[in-house]
Amino acid sequence: VPLGGPNPIRIQSMTNTPTQDTEACVAQAKRIVDAGGEYVRLTTQGVKEAENLMNINIGLRSTGYMVPLVADVHFNPKVADVAAQYAEKVRINPGNYVDPGRTFKQLEYTDEEYAAELQKIRDRFVPFLNICKENHTAVRIGVNHGSLSDRIMSRYGDTPEGMVESCMEFLRICVDEKFTDVVISIKASNTVVMVKTVRLLVSVMEQEGMSFPLHLGVTEAGDGEDGRIKSALGIGALLADGLGDTIRVSLSEEPEAEIPVARKLVDYITSRRNHPYIPGMEAPDFNYLSPVRRKTRPVRNIGGDHLPVVLADRMDGRMETHPQFTPDYIYAGRALPEQTEPGVQYILDADVWKGEPDTWPAFNYAQLELMETCAAELKFLFTPYMALTREVVACLKQHPEAVVVSQSNHPNRVGEHRALAHQLTVEGLQNPVIFFQHYAEDTAEDLQIKAGADMGALIFDGLCDGIYLFNQGKLSHAVIDATAFGILQAGRIRTSKTEYISCPG
């Protein structure tokens, strides 16, 4: 099952059965494959587990399952040597392959001492690569945010730069040894760290002339909506930029349950291929590798240093809300509901807005003259990027109290939303931007995956002052609102509930 280059984005999962239990591992691997998994990873704690990979391989292949097996090795390079003889790929963790276990002590090295530590890695790693060459075994260099060595931590700190260097030390040896059957991964449960680090890794690889394929995943993502949203946000943000060759959606559920979620995410992102060109200009002060929040002028509780807001609608007359996730603003269209929610602000179409308490007018890009005559201290201007004409820009310059609600019907809506936010900055405008995302989903999972994937890059780029999810399917408003708040929390820009880190094994 080839990986990288022009090949499809591959989907994988990991067994949670004891690797010495051949029958259980074979049965679970079959379920993963039957669900659509293309690689199966197995925990390989010791030599006995590594040797049993042969029996698992035989059990699968004798029944027609030719799925490649990936041995997951930590702490013991001898285990990796054995696993390389029986698995199609071996994953090693640079944080504990040669460097001793973490003591969380600050270590001081001279340059000569540091170079000697790197030589220790080379002396142990090269024989392993030779075994892999002999057996045609691929290698995954997999860095985890929580397992950087004391040596790396002492020099680089607990930073994306440290994670990248931990990986690059091993990649440079692979290049020196002309070993190219390598895939790399840098994972974290923190989606911001994960996205920033992968972006940085790709940049450093390009500087050094490397182009190894990437495995993407958010570690310990959890189950239910949290796991799906976090994975869609982190993985989706990178896939949207063309980064990633294989993915795993880590859920604390049965391994085969991860596969349909991953498939939906990949299919949604790849459906944008060959989309129409989006003209645009990147803001001059934007740093893709280390983005900061776009500078905006606060309008009431939107923009500036305020937390991103959640907009919602109740156009169907159903006013139910989630008890824990009440939107900040509700778009009511042509008339206020008979019964309003306490603590909620309402948005009405500008031509029917009469200045009622706790209400604000909404304009479209064809209502600029009406906007000029409106005295509201907060206005919402709904506009797609392609309607951001000179007249609209001039109007926004005269009305810093206007919040832009970015709309898009483009196949690559992430790109068009980005283009709008960047164009505002290029024009010198500091109006806050809320991203309007529309769907027609009938299941919560589909909405979570698509909305998470669409919002990821916008959040991590620092462009998001608010989110407005509009769904024309069968989902309740409570589910839609919870998804919006879940996306902001997964992007670590607004916390609305207790978060549990759940390790699936």
PLM features per residue range, with description:
Residues V1-G5, T17, S290-M319:
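N-terminal basic/disordered segments at the start of proteins
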Residues V1-P2, P8, N16-P18, Y97, ...:
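Short, glycine-/Ser/Thr-/acidic-enriched flexible segments
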Residues P2-S13, T17-G36, V40, G46-V47:
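N-terminal glycine-rich anion-binding loops that anchor highly charged ligand groups
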Residues Q20-R31, F75-D81, C167, S231-I235, ...:
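Short, acidic/polar
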